[in-house]
Structures are given as structure tokens and as C-alpha cells.
């Protein structure tokens, strides 16, 4: 009897404890961090399902002990603990269809409210459910680092996202790469995903080690761009690393020289061209090993600059040198030098090849001069379409000799020049004599050559409406140099017998007076005559003849093929014998009422 009573008491106590919800089940959802700025409002919300009976809900702040803030009972309502300001802490209950939300509103918070807040539900019969929030109240901070990277074009640039990171970085940090130029910002990467659709970086950007940015190849358009990496440690703490790119390009230099006239001025033009320049560079001229200061008489410099569509600069400097008879030396050496900035505060020094020329090559001939030395034109234009105009990189001087002597050019020409000078005649055509006579006289030279020029005077042809007799000291003497060019062995576009006669576009007539002074009077442009030798055929005629024969053979072939097709169509069809006759067999019926066999064969 006593043992049975003991069991009943124990069972009753257990039932009472179940009824009062004494069996507590603790569900800790883990530490949920909530970040908030000082002075802002924060809502802390937790909810539970409606499958159990709600007994009580409460919010508490967890310190050394649990400090209760507010309690809610479905029957008795809300109850705030003493010392809690209702204006700054308000609780609300929202009943949904299948759940109940329990929210704590914190208004105008400060750093003193930072800490852990516990939300608990007392349910019957499941017990107590608890959720803990970690409220962090601190100002927004951004640790920013700026730097500049200098690099050449067509190189690979690697920009790290962060360096010397500490242990406070969470494994769940997020990052993003942005690029900015001229106030326009674009997102390149976010969370390992390439989100940029810009054509300027198509196929050039990628992620490297430790979330670094890899840019290859570097282009001129990348100059001035700022690449920023945002490493978000928390919603209130961001590390930002900004890298500004400065791009440099090593220039290419090219120098040319041309002789624009052959008169007494002896003008020469030197052109220094600087390509693929970035940023801008400066061009300096050196004459006989010394820097040109710009205050020398007879030397003029003009500078031009142009920005191409690719972003590179193109600089052009032109030095014009007028012949000075009082020069101490007969030769002059000229070259140009470019100074351009490079990465790491260094300067690139790019120089052209020195060009040396003679100052005496621009002397004009007098009325009767056995041997006269002149300068060739800087840019020669030829009538033949396949002979491109050339420009001498060094001064090319020639000696006027007798038409029977072949004098080679003592100064080398450029590799682009395919024409060699054979005869140069200063002619003064007379009335009744045309340019054809002068060309025949130029082409009458023999095949042999002597090592030294002849001292025989050149031929002078009188101009129209002028006399060939002796002239007065004050009378004008018109002289026009005609250059006879023959193709060299290296020129495949002209035959070995083609002769091209070219006269200068505009040349001054020399007026000689009795006292030795010289007056200049400009003449007019003469024509260009191309003479074909009697014993040969020019290449255009040969090409036209060959083309005519090819077209003729093709036409004959087409005509033959058409005739063959016509013959095939007109042929009679092949003979086809008729089919053999069909033989019928007679079957006589036993009744004897049918037709005889011979009658059926007739039918």
C-alpha cells in the first residue's frame, strides 16, 4: 500500500511540472550580429510557430546576469521592468496565420546599448525557446590606401587587393573591384563574378592570387584610371585600396633630309619625326656635335604635334638650313635627339643617325662653266606609276659632266630610292629645238664609263624666243637643269632602256651683269617627256600584248566549247529496236463449245 502511494505522488508531481512548463527546451539560434550606427533605430525580431500553446514571451539583455526588459503574457499583456525607458525600448507582438512575431524596437541607440539581447518563448508543452542577438553599435569606418603604379605599354599589370591583413578578417568577408576615370565608375568584379560588360577591358582583366586584379596588356587608354578594391570586413568596416595607373610609351624616331632647291640659296630641310609618344616629349637638334640654341643665322625650326586616335602623340620638327658662304667648314653633321619621360622618374634618350653633307653642293653654274656641282632634289616624282617618290635620308650630290660620261652618285641613297642618276644636262633650248632633241642628246651616251669626269663643257639649248648668239652683260641668261634618269639594276619596274626626263618645277633664271653681280628671275614649269628607245619595247606595251593574247585564247576556248555543246544537242537519238511480238497459246475446252485454235490466232 505504501509503495503504491509513493508512485502516485511521483506521477502527480511530474504532471504538475508538465502543466507549468517546467521542462525547458533551450533553442539557441547562435550569435546573430546586428550592426547599427549611433543615433539610428534597430528592430530585433524573433518568431515562433503557432502549433503550441503560448504561455509567456520576454526580452532580456545578457550581461553578467540576465536583465529582463519586457514580458508579455497573452492574458495580462506587457510588463516593463523598472528602470527601462519606454520611449527608447518598445516591444510589439504581431500574430500571423501560423506564427507569432515578438519585436523589440530600440530607438536612437548609442554605443552603451551594444551587447547581447535574448528573446525567449515559453511554450506548452515544448518548453522554452531562446534566440540571442549581438548588437554592435559603432560608426562607419573605411581604411583607405592610395598609391600610383607606373608601367610601360604592352606589359602585364598585377594589382593586389590587400596587403598585411590581420586575423580580424572573417572568412566570410566580401570584396569588389571598381574602376574609375573622369568621374565615371564601373564595376569589374563582385564576389568572384565578372560583371563588367565594358569593351575597353574585354579579354584583358582577370583575378589573380589573393583576389588581386590582373590587367594584360596595358594600353594607352589605361592612363589615369583608378582601380579600387573594396574589402568589406563588416557592414560598418571597409578596407579600400585605390591604385592609379600611369602609362608610358617609348617613342620611335625617324629623320629625313631633303634638298628643296638647287639655286644659290642652297636650302636644305631636315625633318625629325617622333612616333608612338606618350606622354609628350621634346625634340632637340644637334649641329656638329653642339646643341642648337635657336639664335643662329640662316637656321629655322618649326614644330608640330598631333594626337592620333589610338592615344599616341606624334611630334614633328623641321629644321631649315640656308647655305652660308662664310662657313668655316665645308661639311656639316646634323641629327636630332628626343627626350621622353619613363617609369620610375627616368628619361629615355632616343637619337637618330647623324647625317653629314657638303656645304658646297648648292653652287649654281654661271653662263659657261665646264664642271658644275649641284644638289639633287630632295623629293623626285617620276611619271611611271610604279616608281614611288623617294626622299633622301642623306644629301645626294651629283656632278654635271659631258653626255658621253657616266658619273656615279658619290653619296649613298636610301633603300627606297630605285632610280640612279646617269646624265644631268643644264640645257638652254633654242627656237626650233624642242625637248625631244634634248632627250635624244642625253640618250646618245655610249655604254662605257671612265673613272673621272670629262672637262668638256655641257651643251646649252636656247629657250624659245631667245637668241643663241653672244649676249650683253646685262641681258638675262635662262638656264633650266634637266635630269636624265635611267633605271638601275635593282629596279624591276622599268626596263634597262627606258629613259625618264624630268625638269624642275620652278627654277630661277640667272641674270649676270658686267660687275659680277647676279640677279634672279623665276621661270615657269617645263614639261615631262618619256622617250622610248628605237630598239626596245616599254613594259606597258608588253603587258598589254600578253593580256591580249590571253583574252584571245580564252575566247577561242569558249567558242570551241559552245560548238561542241551544239553538236551534242543536234545529234539524232540512238536506234532502239522494237520489242518482239507476243505469242498466244490456245487452250481448247473439253466441251467443244469454244472457238477453234486457228480462229483465235486470227483474232
UniProtKB/Swiss-Prot annotation:
It is a single-pass type I membrane protein. InterPro entries: CD80_C2-set (IPR013162), CD96 (IPR042381), Ig-like_dom (IPR007110), Ig-like_dom_sf (IPR036179), Ig-like_fold (IPR013783), Ig_sub (IPR003599). Coiled coil: none annotated. Residues 438-450 have a biased composition (Low complexity). SUPFAM superfamilies: Immunoglobulin. The chain crosses the membrane at residues 538-558. SMART domains: IG. Homodimer; disulfide-linked. Interacts with PVR. This is T-cell surface protein tactile. It comes from Rattus norvegicus.
